[in-house]
Amino acid sequence: NMTPDYYAHLYRRYQTYVRCYDKNAPVFKICGGANADDYEWTDVVLRECFRSPAPPQAHGFMDGLSVHYYVGVEKGEHKGSATEFDEARWFDTLSHAVKMEELINRHGAIMDRYDPEKKIGMIVDEWGCWHDVEPGTNPGFLYQQNTMRDALTAGITLNIFNRHCDRVKMACIAQMVNVLQAVILTEGPRMVKTPTWYVFHMYRHHQGAQLVESFLEGVEKIGMKEEEMVPNVQESVSVDEEGVISITLNNLSLTQEQEMEIVLEEKTCEKVEATLLCGGMRDYNTFDMPERVKEECFKDYQRTERGLRLRLPACSVLLLRIG
């Protein structure tokens, strides 16, 4: 129930006494930022934290400013089943996942006014899908299943984070095990990897790599309502220290595969490795069927003089590694 200016004053007060006692382990101070599209909070908190007598080198007395955003909370108390949903809810969910880019752009534009050198990292403290709990489970435990809809939400969101890595310095899915959009579900001694787990496994190659500028031509908007239209394909690209390019692609369509040509500048496809996560929109893994949805080798591509040509299946996440 705090106002942003009151919170900012408290933050300035308390951060004063969070001191660094080990120069080899510096304290990383994160200021509590906005929930979703509360842009006023971001603006007022930064204004008050940068206000004199704050020295310029203190960059607002913070190293990070958080943003908090879940897909699904906009539905209120009854958010809908994690596994029983229709095509309309598919596009509704993915449109809210795509909104992460707008949030980063608009919060980032405010941060740029106070911190043009981007010394303050945007910290997405919690993100992911929030559905209704599984029937028969404790509502307070927030245990939910995890389908290809969640996998695409993860792929979309991680691509957005990668493309904005100049500002986004940390992003935490909530949670990792048994809660909300978890990467692992457990039951006694048994464990199952969710579709989201495989997306994280595929996207690990972006971590520690350098962003590569990329763009898509011929992207179409798809959906069932004007306000919920999403791009049919979405991407991000990076290159590691050994010169290996990682391309992650998402096909948001439920019915249409996409014929794509990957055009590389100053690079030839000497070696290609690819894996795919694909399935029906309601497909998920259980303890009895733990590998119904899993990452598999992908071979439906051909080398060309300019790069690669491929068919991207509907409802899929693809990783390409080009050496």
Predicted regions and their residues:
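C-terminal beta-sandwich/jelly-roll accessory domains of carbohydrate-active enzymes
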Residues: 215-219, 225-230, 250-323
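Hydrophobic, well-ordered secondary-structure elements that form the walls
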Residues: 161, 171, 200, 247, ...
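Feature representing long, continuous alpha-helical segments
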Residues: 98-101, 105, 152-159, 194-198, ...
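Aromatic/acidic polysaccharide-binding cleft in carbohydrate-active enzymes
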Residues: 120-235
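A structural signal for short hydrophobic beta-strand segments in well-ordered beta-sheet cores
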Residues: 235-237, 301
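Noncatalytic carbohydrate-binding groove/subsite architecture in carbohydrate-active enzymes
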Residues: 4-155, 218-227
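Short, well-ordered beta-strand segments enriched in hydrophobic/aromatic residues
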Residues: 243-251
